[in-house]
């Protein structure tokens, strides 16, 4: 087994040959390389598949052997300082290796067809292969300096891929926004690394964990300084995993191609922050203040992400806020010390979210011939609807991914989310209430996405499908030349002027002869004639969806407890995942539930599933075919008092959707406080520099020049000037003599 571990360093390097080959090909023989560009997908997939097989072999050995292997190379700079580089293979590493390689392979296969007509096909495969290499290097790193090196490479690749279509100004601004926002977290991470190096004189994980086990409990070092450095490390994870308040880059990152959105949200960039916290949890767990702060940030993020997803119209941005919320669940689990539940949800969410993003890409691909290739139209759920008849395979896979994320058994995310909910209730009722309520919201907004996309009838002719620029805050423009002047505070997803109501209680009566001319947002009463219809994507794009569907159906089984005997009338818990994670859990002696009561499990499961079903039901009432049915019968108006004033419930509903659609006004706040504030400070500094500093210096120079000119004039050899000053001096002398 040790012989196999010795070659684990090859895994991150396997995708590099194809990257270098494509680079040399584009440089030396560009015409031939571009003409044969589809061939380059095969070696990219092949090499990553070899890495996956190697990773799977290591994982099997981890499960059977339960050991940790670390290999180091030491580079001595001088007698007092040396750098150590190496790789670490433990359960966390093996989990991430399988996650990255499996999702990465499926994304590469999907991209071969999705990007086939794009001029940047080769450039895309170079970027995405290097992205996989960077993430594989990150998870195998044995110390903080290596993690930071690959951390920056991951950020660079995300910058390149988010701005892949850099000729579009909005995409160029989006990658800049992601880069600048992550700079805040990366700066904190670097300061935290330097701080711990100053404390311990080492960057190795074993030395940091020694602090956690020995020095901190015995007050061997300054706990305040250690807490500050740990907070700075956590700041890096906050930015990379899109946690509040550094989450604003994530929805705008959807400007990149859809396959890279799947990779970023499933297995690479946003997973890097969770991985960093999981790797350093033995250190954080000895700092109760930091653990409380982590759980608080996770709780805020999971609730905020769910509320911001409620009213989004862009299918990819809705899924992006869903990712933000689910990452909040993982952060909460790590904050309360539930290491196994956090990693379990990381695994299940990765496959479910990859399925959803690739499914959304299939939907976008099928809509583009109808509405055009502008993301404002092809990704707008308002113009979709009724796609279940045209893309049945995509619809089935998307529905399974949706139900998984909603927490419906026996799909993957049910098992992991239920474990997080149970542990959060045990840790704090406050966290349990927020997490459980958000689980219901998750079911609501996820089923909303499904219904608006696949239910009802096709709405390609729907008018007023997007709000005006003056009416809403487009945060992506904050990083460009223009800045939105206002915020739409009264926006609700409705079209009042056209007589079509989305959430209005006062629904106008629609004459029979006009029902075929007006389309409801949720489900139109009739579809206009069109000669072009959406079509199912090719087999190359459907194959990854079907494989991810299998993962979504069965990956949850690794966390299902099996009977391992009875002790004190309780069934001892044994899962594949717990056996897999045994060495890592032993590092910090996680006080997890070593046993499980079947009654407690059923109680928790019934409550969580009930919340999910309730959310699904409410979403169907508002967005499904039932809404159109009630609207035609004028059913809702019979339940509401008819008065000219809007009801209180309608106002609350309006404010909630205005909050959600405008991203909680957080981007607006950042614009006013930070961006415009920094610009005004820069203008004030420029004025002070030019007006005051330069004014004083120029004034001194001018005064010296004038004095010199006067002296030159006086000493110019004129007798009259000499007599004048002589008389002046004599007069002053006589004046002061008493």
From Swiss-Prot:
Alphabetically ordered keywords of this record: Chloroplast, Membrane, NAD, NADP, Plastid, Plastoquinone, Quinone, Thylakoid, Translocase, Transmembrane, Transmembrane helix, Transport
Lineage: Eukaryota, Viridiplantae, Streptophyta, Embryophyta, Tracheophyta
Chloroplast found in the keyword field: yes
The protein's name: NAD(P)H-quinone oxidoreductase subunit 5, chloroplastic
InterPro entries: NADH_UbQ_OxRdtase_chlpt_su5_C, NADHpl_OxRdtase_5_subgr, ND/Mrp_TM, NU5C-like, Proton_antipo_N
Organism: Sorghum bicolor (Sorghum)
Role of this protein: NDH shuttles electrons from NAD(P)H:plastoquinone, via FMN and iron-sulfur (Fe-S) centers, to quinones in the photosynthetic chain and possibly in a chloroplast respiratory chain. The immediate electron acceptor for the enzyme in this species is believed to be plastoquinone. Couples the redox reaction to proton translocation, and thus conserves the redox energy in a proton gradient.
Chemical reaction(s) catalysed: a plastoquinone + NADH + (n+1) H(+)(in) = a plastoquinol + NAD(+) + n H(+)(out); a plastoquinone + NADPH + (n+1) H(+)(in) = a plastoquinol + NADP(+) + n H(+)(out)
Compartment(s): Plastid, Chloroplast thylakoid membrane
